[in-house]
Structure formats: structure tokens, C-alpha cells
Amino acid sequence: RDQPRSRGLGDVYKRQHQMWLDGLYMGAPFYAEYAFRNNLPKDYADIINQFVTCARHTYDPKNGLYRHACDVSRTERWADPVTGQSKHCWGRAMGWYAMALVDALDFIPKHETGRDSLLAILNNIAVQVKKLQDPKTGGWYQVMDRSGDQGNYVESSCSAMFIYSLFKAVRKGYIDKSYLDVALKGYKGFLDNFIKVDRNGLVTITKACAVAGLGGKVYRSGDYDYYINETIRNNDPKVVGPFIMASLEYERLQK
């Protein structure tokens, strides 16, 4: 509640006047659980508003996706001069946002006004994720609005995040059961394409984008070439954690 706010937006993630998709995971699930465990029902409206506001400012009606961030001041070079949106949908940003939704929904009561808006956003994400799933690997691309384009690649961290989100959303009844097939295809593809086990049994998870952002001292333009040329590395915590979470959801299915 005391987190600094951007004018016309929600919590400040990194900079004033901006809202980033990935920023929702860093605060909203904790906020929702804290409100639930401490009997603070008035906070639910604020939590819901965080998600809805971010979705509204980052939504791209041309493809149904959500772009990485929005700058309502329109002063950043990466921001569209009309919408304030960044140029692309970064897979991991949308993955963080999807995970934030399914985790926060656990603690927001079914009768809460606005909860249906979160379910609608989550269902739209499920539709787009199904549509953009790579048929060969079962994963998702680093730059989702340029899936399959030259230089783009199927990236492991966003893939793990979408798999987890779909598994959990199906289990909790947030989305239709038909999306289980998408999650299962993604999980099998993840094992086949991103998991390497050496002769000593050491597991490596490959092809994770190390980091991506916007602006900063070494300016990050947010254009297509920027995203596809960021460092790729193995065993990044941002893929290890979501893959473990996805695996726990998968194992629930086997019981």
C-alpha cells in the first residue's frame, strides 16, 4: 500500500511513469497472500487494479499480446509517441505476468469485484499462448510477436513460465481443460529440447535469456535486434525456478 505509484498507473517497478509486465510478479502475488492472511479485504481492489491497469496499457490489439512495458510520459526513446508502449512482446515478461495472475488468484475471493477481469486477461493469454506455441519444440519464442522470424529463437524461461501457468490455471479451473494438451506438449518439448544430462547425471537447462530490459545507462532500445542479441545462458535461475514449479504441477497430474 505504501509502494510509490506512477501517475495514472500502479506500483513503481523501476521508474516513475512506467509499468512493466514483469514487475507484477515481483509484488502482486505477495501482496495478495499478505492481504488474505492478514484479513485485509480492502486491498484486493488495489491488487486487481494493478493487473488490469498494466494489461490495459500494454495490450496490443493487433495480435492480442501484451508488450513488455509502457511509459505514460512518452519520454523514453523506446516508447511509442502515441501509446507509450514498448516495441515488442518479450516472452519472459508475459510469462512473469501469467505466473503472477495464477498465483495471485489463489488468494483473491471468488466474490471480489473485478476478479472476473483477471480471469478474462488470463484466458486471453491462454488463447495467444496456444496460438503461438512452436509446433516443433512445444516452446515459445523470445520475441513473441515475431515468432519464427530470422534470428528469433525458442527460449526456455518463458516456455517454463507458460507451462507452469497453464498447468496451474487448468487445475484451478481458471481456464478450459483443453489447454492441458498445450501444457503437456510444452512440458514434453521442454524435456526434449532444453534439458541436458551428462554422464554423471548433472542436469543443465539450456537457452535462457540472461536478462532484458528497457532504457538504462547502457541504453536498451527494446527493438527486435536488441532482444534477440541479449546473452543466452544455461541454468539461469529465472528458468530453473519456473521449471521446478511446472514439474511440481505436472507431478500433481500423475497422482
Where in this protein do the model-derived segments appear?
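Single conserved hydrophobic/aromatic residue that forms the stacking wall/gate
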Residues: 2-9, 13
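Well-ordered alpha-helical scaffold segments within catalytic/enzyme domains
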Residues: 28-40, 96-114, 160-175, 231, ...
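Loop-centered beta-sheet repeat module
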Residues: 44-105
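Catalytic cores of carbohydrate-active enzymes
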Residues: 56-68, 120, 131-145, 191-202
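A beta-strand-loop signature enriched in Asp, Gly, Thr, and Trp
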Residues: 119-187
